[in-house]
């Protein structure tokens, strides 16, 4: 039988190459990957942060595809990971007598962040086409002196062409564990399922096709007053948009939700929040990445 699904994997190991960028430590990496993953050229900012775009060469996922993405940050590393295009999930493959409703495409993400390291994982949006079935799982292990920023933006269907998600389903599970010398603590757990029912429900998405999450887990000893100032600045961003946004304060960090009709508006909101997080963390101001949609760059 000819295999029609992808089984791809990508392993990235980042580490500090001390004082290789003038007087600034530079983060470099080693990698191992198979199709459909492809790594584009990495760059560095003035703080030595490694900026790496990842490309999915197959153009999208269909039922039965299975991907594994593993990221390790060694001590004293700074990394910005992103993707060069939106992730598209199609519903045309995977339907059979055994699975009449289709088969899920799946992605497993394993992330480990060691001492004094900081990972920003900001992929472009995931688009669930009609009848697309997609499940993603994240397991993140982070030290007490490190931070993790993650954005997850989902569009259900192509509303511009009148297409809905129909029988499609999006599932996501995020687990973040904090490591210390004695035991591991649960830092954050989030589980989401989006479907036609939740899309139409008044208590759900209420026919808004774009749903986004921004999660920032900071260092264990991060200043509470700085987090309060951050929340105040983010609320000012909320006042400048007509979209539905909410913010929650975690034990160590924040959680932001977006609900609206425009992916571009969601990206803009998250970029503005990212700038605030960089500022309160004492890092340089982020720049719009060249692999992101060109039309957005005019608004930032």
From Swiss-Prot:
Transmembrane segments: none annotated. It comes from the Bacteria. Its main location: cytoplasm. GO terms for cellular component: cytoplasm. Keywords: Chaperone, Cytoplasm, Nickel insertion. It is found in: Cytoplasm. InterPro entries: UreD. GO terms for molecular function: nickel cation binding. Belongs to the UreD family. UreD, UreF and UreG form a complex that acts as a GTP-hydrolysis-dependent molecular chaperone, activating the urease apoprotein by helping to assemble the nickel containing metallocenter of UreC. The UreE protein probably delivers the nickel. Required for maturation of urease via the functional incorporation of the urease nickel metallocenter. This is Urease accessory protein UreD. The lineage of its organism: Bacteria, Bacillati, Cyanobacteriota, Cyanophyceae, Synechococcales.
């Amino acid at each position: 039988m000819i295999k029609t699904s992808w089984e791809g994997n990508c392993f990235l190991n980042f580490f500090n190459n001390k004082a290789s960028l003038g007087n600034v430590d530079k983060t470099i990496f080693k990698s191992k990957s198979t199709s459909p993953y492809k790594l584009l050229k990495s760059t560095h900012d003035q703080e030595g942060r490694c900026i790496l775009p990842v490309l999915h060469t197959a153009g999208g996922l269909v039922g039965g595809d299975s991907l594994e993405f593993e990221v390790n940050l060694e001590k004293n590393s700074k990394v910005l990971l992103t993707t060069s295009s939106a992730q598209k999930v199609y519903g045309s493959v995977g339907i059979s007598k055994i699975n009449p409703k289709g088969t899920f495409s799946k992605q497993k993400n394993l992330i480990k962040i060691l001492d004094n390291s900081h990972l920003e994982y900001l992929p472009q949006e995931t688009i669930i086409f009609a009848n697309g079935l997609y499940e993603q799982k994240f397991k993140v292990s982070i030290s007490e002196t490190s931070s993790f920023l993650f954005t997850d933006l989902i569009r259900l269907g192509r509303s511009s062409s009148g297409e809905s998600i129909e029988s499609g389903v999006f599932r996501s599970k995020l687990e973040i564990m904090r490591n210390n010398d004695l035991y591991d603590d649960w830092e954050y757990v989030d589980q989401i399922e989006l479907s036609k029912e939740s899309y139409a429900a008044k208590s759900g998405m209420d026919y808004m096709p774009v749903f986004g999450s921004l999660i920032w887990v900071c260092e264990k000893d991060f200043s509470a007053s700085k987090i309060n100032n951050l929340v105040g600045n983010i609320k000012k961003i909320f006042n400048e948009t007509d979209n539905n946004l909410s913010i929650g304060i975690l034990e160590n960090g924040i959680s932001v939700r977006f609900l609206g009709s425009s992916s571009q508006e969601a990206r803009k909101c998250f970029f503005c929040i990212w700038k605030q997080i960089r500022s309160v963390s004492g890092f340089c101001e982020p720049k719009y990445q060249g692999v992101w949609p060109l039309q957005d760059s005019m608004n930032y």
